[in-house]
Regions:
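Metal-dependent de-N-acetylase/amidase catalytic core
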Residues: 1-122
Length: 122
């Protein structure tokens, strides 16, 4: 109910949440909350799922949309390190490799990939 109210108050054009088949429980819960609010809200917006660590944490992720993050990659790395409880030093190399791979898929140096949720009637 809180997520739905937030969406209806803020009226976003787009929301990015975690991929629902993620090995991290908190990520799965977040994804379900956002998806349910998206379905229940009377407000229309695009819903995208992002990946955390494909193959290790984000399972069965098949992108439908890519973004060139070459110009903002360094800022993204800085933002990672603000999440101090997660020990980003240990995963930064993996994230760089994933972003290089996604960049190759969209013909850039660094990229991010997403899956766009398609509306399906119940």
């Amino acid at each position: 109910a809180e997520m739905k109210a937030l969406i209806e108050t803020e009226k976003p054009d787009m929301v990015i949440t975690h991929w629902p088949i993620d090995s991290h429980r908190d990520h799965r819960v977040c994804s379900i909350l956002v998806y349910d609010a998206w379905r229940q809200s009377g407000y229309s917006f695009d819903l995208y799922y992002g990946e955390v660590m494909t193959g290790l944490q984000t399972q069965n992720f098949s992108p439908t949309f890519w973004v060139n993050i070459t110009d903002t990659h360094n800022k993204k790395v800085e933002a990672y390190y603000c999440h101090t409880s997660q020990g980003m030093e240990a995963v930064q190399e993996y994230h760089d490799a994933m972003e290089i791979m996604r960049g190759m898929e969209c013909h850039t140096k660094y990229g991010e990939a997403f899956v766009k949720q398609q509306w399906k009637e119940d």
